[in-house]
Amino acid sequence: MSNVTTPWWKQWDPSEVTLADKTPDDVWKTCVLQGVYFGGNEYNGNLGARISSVFVILFVSTFFTMFPLISTKVKRLRIPLYVYLFAKYFGSGVIVATAFIHLMDPAYGAIGGTTCVGQTGNWGLYSWCPAIMLTSLTFTFLTDLFSSVWVERKYGLSHDHTHDEIKDTVVRNTAAVSSENDNENGTANGSHDTKNGVEYYEDSDATSMDVVQSFQAQFYAFLILEFGVIFHSVMIGLNLGSVGDEFSSLYPVLVFHQSFEGLGIGARLSAIEFPRSKRWWPWALCVAYGLTTPICVAIGLGVRTRYVSGSYTALVISGVLDAISAGILLYTGLVELLARDFIFNPQRTKDLRELSFNVICTLFGAGIMALIGKWA
């Protein structure tokens, strides 16, 4: 004898209920119209394309995340400074747009006050969606504050870095010719080279105590950013593996989505000067980001005939994760990236051409990511 209990909301037949009926109530009608009640699995085949998405997203996400690292840390490579600046500030715009368009809006769409979840049970007693975002943002702020205080008290070093200091880090990290070739050409490590009117910056092994000490604060701030993005990537992967007719349009859009997010993460990661004993950490963090979505796509494929993305439980999980990630990325994008790079950067007015370039790159990244939000 089966012990399965029939859900209470199945006592009414949607085909026999009109919007004017007083019974069942409006919340039940909302849940039916939104597909939460009586919704089903949307999987419609395309297994080959779905399997390919695992490997395509794995390669693209990992490559774009590692590209800034490869460009600045692998010896014998030279890149113009403006290529690095483009990746860095384009990524800043991507992070900010992701917080608003790809996290905040879906969170409200899953557990907001006008949704099925937001009107039922304890979810209907309070505006939990913005409360979760506020809690996440506050936790991120406190983590940033305490880590900064700890670093300053222990090392006497401020978390803030001027634009020139960041540029110096790029100069130190940007790999060029080996020291042997430098000696042969009569140049010193870390020298500034100009060819054909394009500026290049060469590698040097930075061993100053300031760089080693600043690693702590920079790394903690970066971890917060990556965790926020990874939380977001979990539900993206699950949905891509099991979504229905939307798969054909969602697949290419998510490839671009993961690429741009990866570029933003990699650009920020490449500006951190890791101690020699931890030189493998940035590569591991790039791989962690690159693996998250493909693994979740594979999990989605494993449950493709049973997973219902519009179910009550799935909406609660995705809504909470999106709200948490939105709070993290809102603080990181607006404070750690935009405010510190532009508003509180005392060097910003020294080169107005570079400042204009950085602003344009930021707006371009935000605009592209906002456009992608139309489909994903």
UniProtKB/Swiss-Prot annotation:
Induction comment from the UniProt entry of this chain = Induced in activity >100-fold in response to zinc-limiting growth conditions. Not expressed in zinc-replete cells.
Record topological domains on the Cytoplasmic side:
72-80, 144-216, 264-278, 332-354
Asked if the record carries the keyword Zinc, the reply is: yes
Biological processes, Gene Ontology terms = zinc ion import across plasma membrane
Q: Which GO terms describe its molecular function?
A: high-affinity zinc transmembrane transporter activity
Cellular component annotations (GO), alphabetically ordered: cell periphery; endoplasmic reticulum; plasma membrane
Q: Which residues lie on this side of the membrane: Extracellular?
A: 1-50, 102-122, 238-242, 300-310, 376
What kind of membrane protein is this, topologically?
Answer: Multi-pass membrane protein
Q: What Pfam families does the entry give?
A: Zip
Q: Keywords, A to Z?
A: Ion transport, Membrane, Transmembrane, Transmembrane helix, Transport, Zinc, Zinc transport
The main location is membrane
Could you tell me which residues belong to the region Disordered?
177-196
The biased composition feature labelled Polar residues covers 177-191
Transmembrane feature ranges: 51-71, 81-101, 123-143, 217-237, 243-263, 279-299, 311-331, 355-375
Cellular localisation: Membrane
Q: Which domain of life is it from?
A: Eukaryota
Other facts: Inhibited by Cu(2+) and Fe(3+) ions.
State its role. High-affinity zinc transport protein.
Q: Which family does it belong to?
A: Belongs to the ZIP transporter (TC 2.A.5) family.
Q: What is this protein called?
A: Zinc-regulated transporter 1
What is the gene name? ZRT1
